[in-house]
Amino acid sequence: MSSSLGKIALLIDGANLYSTSKALGFDIDYKRLLKEFQSRGSLLRAIYYTAVIEDQEYSSIRPLIDWLDYNGYTVVTKATKEFIDASGRRKVRGNMDIELAVDALELAEHVDQIVLFSGDGDFRSLVEALQRRGVRVTVVSTISIQPPLIADELRRQADVFTDLVELKSKVGRDPSERPPPRELRQHMPEFLQRDTSV
């Protein structure tokens, strides 16, 4: 089974995959995700795209980014842009679509299959361009909830659509299995660290 899909690249829209898995009630186990696709073919790249808020002292996504970076993924980040909307509310924007699209087109001549983890309809034209270059495209998102988290035009354009629910047993983890963040353990008040049972 090691070369059934040929040469593969995984392109993960981090924010989109996060919201999809949360809506379905499970976390993604990125170690298992990598192993699953390594077993399906020759995995050339696994790229995770996410925007980060740079001016925060602590970012909740930083431990994940660091782990991915050291465990077989290429991580592409971009600082978010902060602005005030028309009603005076602070908004944060960080879109990684262009970075993902450029990487996909550059990878096209080196892979047989691209697996895109996103439901964003903006990627329909990208999928079509990849197909014109002879690349098969699998899109992973979900139609298992209402409203579906994948744009209909993206699902129709893909060579294969895989509902994330179908991968849950292979790449999912129950949120209750999540270990406490190292930062919380390191910043625990001293009096909570001592054994007071004496």
Task: Give names to the regions the model predicted.
Residues 1-198:
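Terminal and domain-boundary accessory regions
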